[in-house]
């Protein structure tokens, strides 16, 4: 990557306790150059359309459309709608494979760090961990 937010990685942290606002997962989106990240609270059952809306508002509106995205083979990232949308904005999709998991290694390390931070918050904040996610994101992005 030559410019920030040009190449990104993304994955989901799932299986979290449901919050009062019905969030039970976090969409982790990482800039592969600067290692900075966005932690977006979602519900695992959100449609791809809803995820595209969030992505447009939280990523594209702030950073522009990336040149390339590395992600796992989650069905949401493999859907026709997601692929067509990314093609329209000129973003290349790179799926990590079971044989080459290092392609998603950066997002996996970020997710592990996030999960460690979240464990403390979930214990302390119970059903409101999503309200504290911006502070966790700030702490993560200012810790290196």
Name what the model sees in each region.
Residues 1-144:
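Integrase module of LTR retroelements
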């Amino acid at each position: 990557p030559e410019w920030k937010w040009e190449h990104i990685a993304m994955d989901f942290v799932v299986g979290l306790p449901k919050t009062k606002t019905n969030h039970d997962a976090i969409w982790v989106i990482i800039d592969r150059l600067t290692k900075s990240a966005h932690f977006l609270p979602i519900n695992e059952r959100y449609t791809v359309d809803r995820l595209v809306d969030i992505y447009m508002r939280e990523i594209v509106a702030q950073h522009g459309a990336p040149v390339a995205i590395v992600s796992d083979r989650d069905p949401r990232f493999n859907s026709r709608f997601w692929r067509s949308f990314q093609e329209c904005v000129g973003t290349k999709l790179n799926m990590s494979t079971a044989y080459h998991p290092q392609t998603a290694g950066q997002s996996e390390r970020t997710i592990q760090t996030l999960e460690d931070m979240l464990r403390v918050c979930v214990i302390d904040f119970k059903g409101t961990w999503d309200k504290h996610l911006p502070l966790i994101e700030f702490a993560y992005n200012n810790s290196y």
